[in-house]
Structures are given as structure tokens and as C-alpha cells.
């Protein structure tokens, strides 16, 4: 909550306490109704007990495309993130000074909410520093570190979306983690790597 208000102060952020399930939908809906909002849009692609999968585009779009269609917003606006956030150069510099010790370095982010991606690390030069993005600080604190990297290696996460939406770097590597509906649409060039840790069930099409 704190980092959201710090970097997107134009949004009225409403905290909701996590519980056994109602916080996903019922409580947020009630809070918004109490604020007498003119329009309430639920951007969940799927949620138990809710008919979101009945939308005609559900079976044919990725999760991020689904949200933009639902909201009636052009999908290309996904890459206008820079216009929507306020960067904090002091926090970014502090993170840079804390983690960067070699001018030649690669930034990695391999941990997702439910899995850790793998890759052949021999592609990284031995004299380069490897900087894994951690939960330290705000996610936006890492922007200067990422911008200074000679290579970026990431899996399906908020960080890879951030890099793509802000078009950071040119030598970018993406490690897939989910099936096509839960994989984000990227607008910039990435080299895709095999993920030895991927769940085989996420593969929709298989060769015999």
C-alpha cells in the first residue's frame, strides 16, 4: 500500500485486510459501493464462484488483454506506464549503491508467486556480477539498477512486465512459467529461454 501511494499518488488506494476469501471480491465491492462510485469494474479474469469466464473473449485472450477489453481501454495503453508513475531518484540511487559492485552486471528475477524459473547460467560471462532482484525496498526502487544492466533475465512476474512496459534495456531474456492465458503479452523484443523447471501441464500443444 505504501509504495503504491508513493509512486501513483493520483489513485485513491483503498486497503483491504486479507481474510479467508471475501477480501477477493465481496469486501472490495462493498467498500467501493460505500464510496458511491459511479462505475465499478471487476478486472479479475477468473475467480471461484464468479461468471467472469462467460465473457466471449475469455477463452481467446491473455489475462492482461482480458483486463483491457473489460475496461474498454486500448491495449496499447499498457505501454504508457511511464506516464502513470512518479519515480523517486533518491530511492533508486540508494538501491543502486547498495547492490551494484561491478560495472558489468546482469539483473535476474526468477521467483514468481508459485514457482522459481531455471535457465542455463553459463550464458552469463564469468566476470559479470549477477544481481537478483529481491523483496528489498519498493519494486520501483530497482529501476536504476535494471536500466544500468547489460543484460536482463526474468520470468513471468511484475518485474518483467515493468521492464517491458517501460522498454528498459535491449538484451532481454524471458523464461516462461505459465500457459498462454496467464503469460503476459510483451510489446518489446525478448529472447525466450527454456525453463527446465516448468510444469509440463502448462503446455497446451504437445508433439507426439
Residue ranges and their predicted role:
Residues 1-208:
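Catalytic machinery of carbohydrate-active enzymes
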